[in-house]
């Protein structure tokens, strides 16, 4: 079968890969990089079937462009489909507000949802003599790996985490011939999660004890809920704002994808929700505010940031990746942010914590060795070659975006 990455092979972001053979063409994921303006993958040819691993924009953000055009089936978990719909609609909303290119229409999103064929972990379908199974990826609720089997089996990981988080269990390895695997954390390992949680909670209490406000900018999908679950046993006035509220409700609609539904339900009850703009005045008087956007570039976080930025007693606790050319990265590197076009110095405390939902360098290596593939194909990484010294017993393939290569499937 012929394979080609349309994006995301040698970079983190805008994922997309075609598989072509047996008279059919499959597209696995089709995302965008949510930069300013967004960056898109290479144009997709006509597609017969599309497989979506999960709902983050770098994996799902361009799916409506293909499905709106080709009316192809979209195989994914029902939870990923519903959250992806939120993300796609938000992408259009931002494009209109910022005068960016609109890569698809609202009608394309509607057609995409009509073309969804729900699958869940353990399900298997057959398309043109190729069996396709779905496995738990452990990244965020509803995230999946796909196993394609004909003469041999091929696993496509999407984004994975092999260690359990509060929100989801970890991914389990499975023997395979070909393993397409992400390499986001090609050059470092995460600190033990328990240590990170302990340090984070200690800082929260320290800031509140000195009379400050704790602002936790979070991604809507996964990180907001993970942090809410971590904070739920604290006896403080806590608020949650932004799209994370809607995502939490969707997660609770699909408890089968959660490690412990009761823990998330309990966390949701402990937080006050900002349901209308007027509630933000009350939220600003709270002690802990968990809000989108996770990189400080837009959303409700800007208003809260503006409120506390000159208060040395308060703190911004970053809990997610801060990409280049974002407010979050500028804050880390220069101690300032851009608000309403003006560069502002930030005087409150800043701390960063590693709550990644991706497997780290050593976890990826352990996963590969447990799968014991003949061929390892790295993707979703800008430093894939750093894995090579540890994988001399495997045939490692580092495809470039736009490069076609063949594998037995």
Which sequence ranges carry the predicted segments?
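Core dinuclear metal-dependent hydrolase active-site scaffold
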Residues: 1-45, 118-169, 281, 288, ...
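Pre-active-site segment of Zn-dependent metallo-hydrolases
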Residues: 9-14, 18-72, 76-115, 162-169, ...
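Active-site neighborhood of phospho(di)ester-bond hydrolases with catalytic His/Asp-centered motifs
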Residues: 28-30, 47-58, 62-63, 74-78, ...
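Metallo-beta-lactamase
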Residues: 88-140, 256-285
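Acidic, Ser/Thr-rich peripheral helices and adjacent loops at domain boundaries
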Residues: 96, 100, 249-269, 325-348
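Active-site-proximal loop/helix segments of hydrolase catalytic cores
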Residues: 138-143, 151-177, 182-184, 189-191, ...
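Cap/insert and terminal regions of metallo-dependent hydrolase folds
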Residues: 163-241, 315, 338-397
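Hard-cation-handling environments
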Residues: 201-319, 324, 379
